[in-house]
């Protein structure tokens, strides 16, 4: 490890730091010692550290944040995830961007009132094809004559394919939709393969509910508001109010008493005090500060999502081996990421069967904590697995909703949101025991 001396902090800041070895720097004027680490392996991982498997499938923990130099990670190492909590010898790891990124691979719709009398009947089903968007439900109406479930399923498949072609869907999209006979339950199952819509994953990925069970407006997760940088780690109502004076929303319609989708930014103090559209807020909250606290700092449990699961491991055991048929006549795992994690466990020596599983309430709550995000964000950004900016003037440790955190850009004064813990990128949770 190199040891260097600088006359001042300005000289140190101006110097080019090494990218392949660690360095200890002494600032002569202040006698400050600064350690610049590069890919430092540790046996005592903490939140934000990056987890790899070496070429022998051994777990390697590397110090996160500014210590990571992705370009110089050994090519034989596989990036597994990030440490998001540590309790004694137990280490929690988020698995990011692994061999299979999806929680859920199929969406199914049951047609239960199939008539098998050989006469002609008409049936209409509503499906979300993602055309023109995932909020659009398309009616598929067709006639069928069937004496068996298989005949009804074939007619349904033909109707779906024809409707998709009419809508201009690609051949790949058409191939994802089909229907098959569920003889045991005397019904037809309409199936969509390769489910990747973010809203579908966001809810179904953790609870396995179907589109029909999803709320029209899913509940948002709110956390502490305020700006965090490496220079000013202040998170409080006063800062929020100061920013919202000019940066808050000016409502153009009546404000609900709790934030809804699209209303992630609080109204301005002036609007709260005098706008006709804030009458509900003034009647509910005595002060603007109370409005901020109740709407933007208190975290309410979600009706859906990972907070509905008391035990992620129990859910994993229930769902890991569930299969679904394929249009080509084979079978596949319905929850491929869960199967991969729970059944294969990455082949790590000492990692028992089933150590990887879906987050439950405890794991999910930890993932939503702002202090966890503060530690994870620099490492995630350094590894380039999600779009989080962690420069000193741009990171903001506030929950916007279940997937997003705010980014405050100190250069232009604007707020942005980016995925941090994302149901497409974040798969199962691992609980590992260190020696």
Model-derived features: where do they sit?
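Short, compositionally biased
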Residues: 3, 10-22, 48-110, 201, ...
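Surface-exposed ligand/attachment interfaces on beta-rich extracellular proteins
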Residues: 11-45, 147, 346
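Beta-strand-rich, repetitive solenoid scaffolds
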Residues: 27, 36-37, 52-54, 61-64, ...
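Extracytoplasmic/secreted proteins, especially bacterial periplasmic and envelope-associated proteins
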Residues: 151, 155, 159, 336, ...
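Extended, beta-strand-rich, solvent-exposed assembly scaffolds of outer structural proteins
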Residues: 50, 113-204
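C-terminal, surface-exposed recognition/capping segments
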Residues: 61, 334, 343-344, 361-435
């Amino acid at each position: 490890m190199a040891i260097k001396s600088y006359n001042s902090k300005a000289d140190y800041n101006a110097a080019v730091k090494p990218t392949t070895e660690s360095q200890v720097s002494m600032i002569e004027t202040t006698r400050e010692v600064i350690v610049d680490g590069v890919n430092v392996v540790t046996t005592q991982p903490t939140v934000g550290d990056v987890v790899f498997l070496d070429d022998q499938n051994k777990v390697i923990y590397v110090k996160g944040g500014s210590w990571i130099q992705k370009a110089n990670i050994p090519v034989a190492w596989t990036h597994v995830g990030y440490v998001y909590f540590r309790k004694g010898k137990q280490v929690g790891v988020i698995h990011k961007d692994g061999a299979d990124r999806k929680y859920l691979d199929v969406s199914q719709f049951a047609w239960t009132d199939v008539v098998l009398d050989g006469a002609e009947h008409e049936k209409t089903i509503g499906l979300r094809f993602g055309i023109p968007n995932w909020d659009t439900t398309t009616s598929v109406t067709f006639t069928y004559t069937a004496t068996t479930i298989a005949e009804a399923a074939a007619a349904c498949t033909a109707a779906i394919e024809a409707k998709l072609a009419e809508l201009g869907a690609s051949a790949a999209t058409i191939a994802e939709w089909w229907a098959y006979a569920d003889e045991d339950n005397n019904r037809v199952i309409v199936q969509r393969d390769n489910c990747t819509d973010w809203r579908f994953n966001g809810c179904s990925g953790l609870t396995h509910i179907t589109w029909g069970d999803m709320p029209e407006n899913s509940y948002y997760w709110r956390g502490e508001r305020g700006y965090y940088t490496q220079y000013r780690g202040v998170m409080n109502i006063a800062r929020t109010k100061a920013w919202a004076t000019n940066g808050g929303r000016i409502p153009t319609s009546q404000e609900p008493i709790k934030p809804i989708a699209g209303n992630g930014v609080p109204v301005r103090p002036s609007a709260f005090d005098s706008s006709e559209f804030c009458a509900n807020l003034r009647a509910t909250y005595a002060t603007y500060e109370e409005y901020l606290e109740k709407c933007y700092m208190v975290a309410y449990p979600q009706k859906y999502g990972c907070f509905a699961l008391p035990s992620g491991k129990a859910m994993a055991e229930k769902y890991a081996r569930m299969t679904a048929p394929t249009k080509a006549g084979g079978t596949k795992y319905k929850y491929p990421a869960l199967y991969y994690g729970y059944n294969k466990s990455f082949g790590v020596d000492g990692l028992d069967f089933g150590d990887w599983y879906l987050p439950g309430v405890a794991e999910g709550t930890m993932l939503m904590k702002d202090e966890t995000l503060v530690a994870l964000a620099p490492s995630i950004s350094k590894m380039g697995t999600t779009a989080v900016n962690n420069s000193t003037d741009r990171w903001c440790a506030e929950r916007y909703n279940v997937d997003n955190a705010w980014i405050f850009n100190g250069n232009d004064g604007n707020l942005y949101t980016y995925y941090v813990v994302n149901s497409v990128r974040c798969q199962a949770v691992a609980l590992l025991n260190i020696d």
